[in-house]
C-alpha cells in the first residue's frame, strides 16, 4: 500500500508554519498511528495525544493544532459502496472542542469511507482535508510502487 504519512506530515508542517512546539491528536488503531507518531516526534512536536476512537476527544481538541483520523478496522461499506456507518468524528464533537478557539485546527481524514463529518470543515477555525481532497493533491502510486508493496 502507498504510504502517505510523510506527505501528510509535510502538508501539516506547511499549513501550520512548522510543527515544532505544537500538539497533535492521532485517532485510530495503534499500528496505524505509530508511523505518524514517529514522524511528528522527529518534527519536534511538543505533545502527541493518541486515541483508539474519536469518542471523548472534544476535551483534547482545545490543546491541539493537528488531528489525524485514520481508518478504523470495524467500519465497513454498504451494498452501494458507501459507508454503512456515520462519520465517527462529528461536527458537533469538533465544535465543542473548538469553543473560544483562536488558532486554526487542521484535520486530516485518512479513512477512505470518511471518518470526519464534512460539515466540520465549515467551522470557522477548522481546516479539513477530506479523503477526496487528499486523493486530488497527493501523488498517486505508480504501477511499479503498487507491485512492490
PLM ranges: what are they?
Residues 36, 90, 111:
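Conserved sugar-transfer catalytic core signal across GT-A, GT-B, and GT-C glycosyltransferases
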Residues 88-95:
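Amphipathic helical hotspot of TIR/SEFIR-family domains
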Residues 5-6, 95-106, 110-149:
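Adenosine-phosphate binding glycine-rich loop
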Residues 1-81, 86:
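Hydrophobic, well-ordered beta-alpha structural blocks that scaffold small-molecule cofactor pockets
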